[in-house]
Amino acid sequence: MPSFDITSEVDEPSLRNSVDVANSKIAGRHDFKGTSANVELKEKLMTLYGDSDFQLDQMKAILLPEMTKKKVDVRCLEYGDVQKVSGNKVKQEVKVRVGVDQDLAKKIVKLLKDSKLKVQAAIQGDAVRVSGAKRDVLQEAIALVKKQITDFPLQFGNFRD
């Protein structure tokens, strides 16, 4: 029975590279000279440090296009609240979401069941396995999920016949 997996992955070297390039651009910009503006990446958590909310917005305006250039989907980012740090400094934590979380997986399974396509969907950890009788039905399922789920980057892989 043909099947495929729906996952959500982030290319970590590309993510680290885009953060490094953004940091070098921030260091070279005249309006950031003498400030504490920088971006840190630890595991799946980016932290933006700056002197004001405006600086954080400017840093995002540098970082997001760099991520797009490196083919890192910016929809995987989940922004936290801006926090005041010592003095007049601010920071913002940005989570890099990897894997299909349970709520999204349930939404995908419900979407496929309600569509009346002859496929079975099962949640397997941080992925959703979809299997069906024919390859054409699986392609319809992929098209349906791509059309309906647009707020989170999904990859379709591990095809088996």
From Swiss-Prot:
Keyword Cytoplasm attributed: no
Organismal lineage: Bacteria, Pseudomonadati, Pseudomonadota, Betaproteobacteria, Rhodocyclales
Organism field: Azoarcus sp. (strain BH72)
Molecular functions (GO terms): nucleotide binding
UniProt keyword list: Nucleotide-binding
Entry superkingdom: Bacteria
Known function: Nucleotide-binding protein.
GO cellular component, one term: cytosol
A Pfam family annotated for this UniProt entry: DUF520
Protein name: Nucleotide-binding protein azo2183
Keyword hit for Nucleotide-binding: yes
Residues spanning the signal sequence: none
Family designation: Belongs to the YajQ family.
